[in-house]
Amino acid sequence: MSISHFTALIWLGFLAVVALIALGYVLVQRSRHRQMLRFSNMEVLEKVAPSRPSPLRHAPIALMLVGLVFLTIAAAGPTSVQKVPRNRATVVLVMDVSLSMEATDVPPSRLEVAQQAGKEFVDGLTQGINLGFVTFAGTASVMQSPTTNREAVKAAIDNIKLAERTATGEGILTALQSIETLATVLGGAETPPPARIVLMSDGKQTVPDDKDVDNPRHAFTAARLAKSKGIPVSTISFGTEWGSVEIPDQDGQGGSQRVKVPVDNESLREIAKLSGGEFYTASSLEELTAVYDTLEEQIGYETTRGDASRPWLLLGMLVVAAGIVTGLLYRQRLP
């Protein structure tokens, strides 16, 4: 029963009263003992009284004092930090669908593993969250607008089609637009629901050029825009340094060449930093699933202060009742 705060702290002052009662009981017991020794016929007393009084004679008052302590804590209105499912939030999963996702360094392929882990992420999110799905290669597409229909999102993940080039910035900008559209449709609330973008990619941006950081469509520019809107972008760098794919030659002769497609941790780390999100890496299904599990905890739940007085109230009542019962069972009187 953890406590993080009290709503009526003044009631804890009653603990001083409990302490005075305990002190008074001790003083009364000592006074009675002295009076008994002073005025009693010791020969008679030794014959009729037990040689050593049972310590159980103090149990009733001890239990009732402890019960009063618990009841006092309950009266002070204790609260605790509680984790509760979010019932108002928007998340957009943004997935890289460039040709590099065909790489088999994460067996059976980056794409298949990303699809499997992505669908598990969808299933794991709490039902109150509106979840959307965006893909990007040379351009970005809204595969599923934010919705609470999890089956629709999983169907969209199953329908991924790979394409050339990588426009990471377009993916972020499209996700932002999707979030804003939902907020407009919902309306009514004084503040828009909290939102988060989860971006999974395996390579460096190629459209626009990765070095053209001032381009309004650049991923870094999009990340700064997300930051200004209060929408963090959590990024996942997925794959290994030794990934490669077969790329058809452009000469039309039917040939191909193997091209290395290593992951680009630095760019994705910078996107997360600029937007206020968090950066993760994954090079296997297990690692990607673990990342999504972490994000589910962060996104799907929020911490709030909740009333924690009931356990203390019940415990206090039980202990006081135990004190009364003990007093009835073990009360001793001299004959």
Swiss-Prot record:
What InterPro entries does this protein map onto? Aerotolerance_reg_N, UPF0353, UPF0353/GerABKA_families, VWF_A, vWFA_dom_sf
Q: Where is this protein found? A: Cell membrane
What is any Pfam family matched here? BatA
What UniProt keywords are attached to this protein's entry?
Cell membrane, Membrane, Transmembrane, Transmembrane helix
Q: What main location does UniProt list?
A: membrane
Q: How does it sit in the membrane?
A: Multi-pass membrane protein
Signal peptide start and end residues: none
Q: GO terms for CC?
A: plasma membrane
Transmembrane spans: 8-28, 61-81, 310-330
Where does the record place the VWFA domain? 90-295
Similarity comment: family membership? Belongs to the UPF0353 family.
Name-wise, this protein is: UPF0353 protein NFA_34780
**Which organism does this sequence originate in?**
Nocardia farcinica (strain IFM 10152)
